[in-house]
Amino acid sequence: MYKKILVPTDGSEFAKKAQKHALFLANISGAEIIAVSVTENNFVNGLPLDDEIYQLNQILNERSEENLKEFDKLNESDVKITHVIREGSPAKVILEVANEENIDLIVMGSSGKSGFDRFIMGSVADKVVNSAKCAVLVVH
């Protein structure tokens, strides 16, 4: 049924729950997992690239790598997991990777945003659900 499952991860508890669901589904379907971690860098766009900005980007990329390694630790079977780290808007990157990789299912955690931020920006999960060309499972 599923051949490729995309699992965005940001290290949140909702993302970890989604990872467990994705691993279960991949295990029973024989699917491979593409795990994506997005470094959101819109706050530095347009700023001159000095040492502090460079260091901040390095820290964010290291966190992305750590999140993906934590996901690997949950994999108790032989599910193939491929890591992807990208910079940009999370929803946009998730949708791009889904299209590039011909993803059958996206399994993601519900957004951790609340209040005014969510009202203004909407959640990543909302944007993905409304724009994805494949099935999306949102885990809360």
Predicted regions, residues:
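Short loop/turn motifs at secondary-structure junctions
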Residues: 1, 29-32, 79-80, 102
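Structural beta-alpha unit
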Residues: 73-106
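Intrinsically disordered or low-complexity boundary/linker segments at protein termini
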Residues: 1-17, 77, 82, 131-140
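A short acidic, glycine-rich active-site loop
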Residues: 53-66
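Small/aliphatic-rich secondary-structure junction motif
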Residues: 3-52
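Short beta->alpha linker loops
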Residues: 63, 85-89, 111
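Gly/Ser-rich helix-loop-strand patches that form or flank binding pockets
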Residues: 96-140
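Hydrophobic alpha-helical membrane-association signature
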Residues: 18, 64-67, 124
